[in-house]
Amino acid sequence: MARRFATRVTVSGTTFVRELDGILEYRLNTNGLQILLTQDPNAPVAGFMVTYHVGSRNEAIGYTGATHLLEHLMFKGSKNFNKENKKTIWEILETKGALVNATTWNDRTNYFEVMPKEHLGTAITLEADRMRHAHIREEDRQSEMTVVRNEFERGENNPMEALDKQIWALAYEAHPYHHSTIGWRSDIEKVPIARLKQFYDDFYWPDNATVSIVGGFDVKEALAMIVKEFGKHSKKKGDYLAMYTEEPNQEGERRATVARAGNTDLVGIAHKVPAAVHSDIPALIILALILADGKTSRLYRTLVDSALAIDVSTNCYQFHDPSLLITYATLASRTPHQKIEELVKDAYRAIALKGVSSTELNRAKRSIRTYIASLRDGPYAFLSALNEQIAAGDWTRFVTFPKKLVQVSAKDVQRVARQYLIDDQSTVGWFKALPQI
Amino acid sequence: MKKQTYGAQAFSIVEGGKLLVAPTSAKDVVAVEGSVLGGSNHLPKRWDVIPSLSAELLDAGTNKKKKGVIRGALADRGISLSFSAGGDRTFFSGQCLPEDLPFLLSTIAECLGGAHFPEAEVKAAKARALGSIAELKTDTNMQARIALSRILYDTAHPNFSRTLEEEETSIRSSTRRNLLDFRHKFCRDGLVLAVTGDVNAGTVRKAAEKAFGKLPAKGFAPLAKQLNKKPSASAEKLIPIPDKANVDVLLGAALPLHKSDPLFYPAYLLAEMLGGGFASHLMMTIRERDGLTYGVYATLRGFDGATDGYLRIWATFSPEKYTESVAALRKEVRTFFSTSITEKALLKKKEEITGSYLVGLSTARGLARILHQFTIDGRDLAFLAEYPDYIRAVSLAHVRAAAKLVPLHKLSFAASGTFPKI
């Protein structure tokens, strides 16, 4: 994906919006569908992704997990692609070698195909069809509910996932980041099909979606195909339901414990951070890398090199709304939770008080440069990364964000550590292994 | 017509090593995949933890450089590097910017040739390994996998797993000397190195020759072929673990087959038709039709180097539907073998695999992995282009011959989780 060719063309029915670093943006005139194209004419493979601007942040009590369950039902067939006419997505795309799947997260839902390029037209036609003509049926909900419930159960088998759910649920009491994308078990089991259909009709429209194509394809042909297939749909009549709930200010540290039979002990420490587009996020990303990226990071050396923990990670989430910076440590046998919690907080305080070295700053920037280069290695990595920026609210961050990371100074890192890593804004979780009976 | 080899070139390097280089259009991305001979199958069973402890500590200090110097220099350049251990080989995987490739290759070679495993690092690695073992004791998937391997294989076979308690004993008694003795046998004979991405073949070759030429000429040797001595039996093993929301279920059978056997690819297609991808028989029935699982998969496993492997069917089930689900799984496996191995199903699967092969080659990392894997399987560079033809050439008769290797009425069974009270 090195040489991206910005071959801007004019295709009736579309409006060219802009070009940025080889990514062409268009709009479909009739319904407002956003289109992002990045061409590599010599590539034998193309990737196609539809990103709907709806995720679990658009759910509420009673239908948590609805976005994800609906994502599953979207594979049950649509008007022109279904079991009855033997044209399921598996039959017409997976059996041609396409990587076919979908993912749901807090702020978005995506559907994608990465395939030999001659099948791109099929993917466009199918995705356009299920955008407005998906079969959302009770008989499919019944069989798919148990599939999703088993996905939930798999997650519950994992101590880290169980603790993570508790930390988010405690850190957010009002905002829907409170619940995980997969939802609460009882909602998965009981959400009525009418609610899922309503969810589909509320959010699955062209003016609430972005289609992206990366790899080997002809820009003019692809745009014409998009006009033909997605142009069949009108834009939504009426406004989209706004998610207006804001998380109230946190007034003091919060603590959670998950105690289950087993041998795994974990500590998780979360702090509130601003939304992805906020100007402090680049410094927070660098801070997270200095804390726990690689074997030279502060927490790895303190916790893992010393064998107090088996592993450690720090992640600064970049979501549409304010979210969390979280450190997780898996404890070695006999290490007390309290000790790990204190050492992590000591590491935070050290940066807040004394800052970081130029060596640490440069390593973090070099690491992220390598990582960002890898995001353009192949259609799926590219689409996936672009999709997260779409979800955060501004796809151009895919191009501009790396430049902002380069500009982060040691003082910026110290400032954000002081501003955000404060106990009053923290949520601490312990997973405690209970003796097996 | 000229066959597509994706711009890859193969070189013999450092007397016994093989280098594969494939420049791609990826900018600023260099992917490295490689390995040297030396894995758990080269050691007595009781020492099978040594290769993984060694792999963890290869970058923790060498005869010339301390841990902090090695790791710091890699971090200064934004290089990621990891080592891991397998049955016959010790693997390395890295990523760097183009200008740092010579440094990455020289660091890999220095670690392989000079790691000296300081006592304090060995002690810490053992403590971490014991912690990981403790975690695995309540991992339902791992427990079922260990149980199945013990049912299928004789105790001397490489695919026979020891218990986690036995592993703990081995970790505790491992010494720095064990690690040094193992590492001293890494050599350039059998080295395989694949480098792809934003690279130039001439530059890579020069850097690889310089770096790996310092490894000893001889050491670990390829292992002789093995065959399982344990007869098939429809044995069952349940491993209860409290407080688990999901049960991991495995069905399997040892196959009298090696990777170099003509029936290997037919057996691979058979497994893929049974449980590879959403369109496979088991996913279409157990998940799509019955809604009993999030995932059910059939794969060929345990075909490391010269080892005869096995067919493994893995599914996850809800405890409350456990009995019904296991019965459905067994029934659908039988149905597949009796009615679903058809010309039409085979044609579809062949088209899927040849298409997905192309998709897999579309990243520098994917291309490096495939180049490395084909080479350690004993294939030459031409196989990169010929692989789709190999798949297309598999006939229904071949697949049915492979199916006869599966002792359908003697499939073994292992499951772990919180079981319903019956």
Give the label of every model feature segment.
Chain A
Residues 5-26, 169-209, 241-247, 284, ...:
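Histidine-acidic residue clusters that define the catalytic metal-binding segment
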Residues 38, 43-59, 65-69, 84-130, ...:
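M16 family metallopeptidases and their MPP-like homologs
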Residues 76-83, 131-139, 356:
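Short, polar/flexible loop-turn hinges at active-site or ligand-entry regions and domain interfaces
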Residues 121, 142, 189, 197, ...:
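Generic structural signal for individual residues within well-ordered alpha-helical segments
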Residues 149-155, 245-260, 366-375:
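Short, conserved secondary-structure transition motifs
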